[in-house]
């Protein structure tokens, strides 16, 4: 690493798993090197700190056995993440993740994440397409509400936001009808994880897409699942 600040330090990982899965990268302390920490967390990743202690607090349990799970703490990096970049380009957030049947992280993230909304030429969209036209009567969408949040019911415990930033805020659903996109559903100021849109008039279409207009704070659109049903 060359002397100086604000630079990237590249290194190769010799690990090549047989199938996509989570990876744990341990960065050990070095008095001559510092890592940058961003002011926001990154979906699909966790940043933990080594506490050096493997025993749970005595007042929490009747026993004091060594527990490796308490060795790594998330609290020091709550709502933050170490700055890093990966290459080549990952498919961990590819569009097909929104139709793989998983609603929670398992062996990796299971959601579609768009490119950043800021500066984009057009609103990001997620499209479903069939070999032949279908009659669509209901669309169900599951957005990301980030399961990695420290939330309890004590009144003094507050988050820096009132609505989960990762939730999509404004969006519309369009169907390809007679050679053009037709809006069949629209939502404003969304703050829910799961949305169900029952169409007043079922529509015949071979293509359907979810167009994200804004989020509640996240730089990108994040969609866990989208399902389409007949009337």
Q: Which role does the model predict for each range below?
A:
Residues 21-26, 136:
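Short beta-strand segments enriched for Tyr within beta-sheet-rich domains
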Residues 1-17, 27-28, 165-180:
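Surface-exposed turn/loop modules enriched in turn-prone residues
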Residues 31-57, 102-183, 189-231:
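Aromatic, loop-rich ligand-recognition surfaces of beta-strand-rich domains
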Residues 42-104, 118-119:
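PGST-rich, cysteine-poor low-complexity/disordered linker and tail segments that act as flexible spacers
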Residues 15-19, 201-204:
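Surface-exposed, short loops/turns at beta-strand junctions within beta-sandwich domains
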Residues 17, 72-73, 191:
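A general structural signal for short secondary-structure boundary/capping elements
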Residues 1, 12-14, 95-108:
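Helix N-cap / beta->alpha transition motif
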């Amino acid at each position: 690493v060359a002397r100086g600040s604000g630079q990237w330090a590249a290194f190769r990982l010799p690990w090549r798993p047989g199938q996509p899965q989570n990876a744990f990268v341990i960065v050990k302390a070095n008095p001559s090197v510092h890592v940058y920490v961003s002011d926001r967390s990154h979906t699909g990743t966790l940043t933990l700190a080594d506490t050096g202690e493997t025993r749970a607090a005595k007042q929490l349990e009747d026993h004091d056995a060594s527990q490796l799970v308490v060795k790594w703490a998330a609290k020091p990096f709550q709502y933050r993440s170490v700055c890093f970049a990966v290459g080549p380009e990952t498919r961990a957030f590819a569009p097909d993740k929104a139709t793989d049947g998983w609603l929670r992280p398992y062996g990796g993230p299971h959601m579609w994440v768009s490119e950043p909304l800021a500066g984009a030429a057009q609103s990001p969209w997620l499209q479903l397409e069939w070999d032949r036209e279908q009659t669509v009567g209901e669309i169900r969408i599951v957005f990301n509400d980030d399961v990695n949040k420290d939330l309890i019911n004590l009144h003094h415990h507050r988050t820096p936001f009132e609505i989960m930033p990762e939730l999509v805020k404004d969006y519309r659903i369009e169907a390809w009808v007679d050679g053009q996109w037709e809006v069949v559903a629209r939502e404003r100021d969304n703050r829910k994880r799961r949305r169900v849109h029952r169409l007043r008039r079922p529509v015949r279409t071979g293509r359907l897409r979810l167009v994200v207009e804004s989020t509640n704070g996240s730089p990108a659109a994040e969609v866990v699942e989208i399902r389409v049903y007949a009337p």
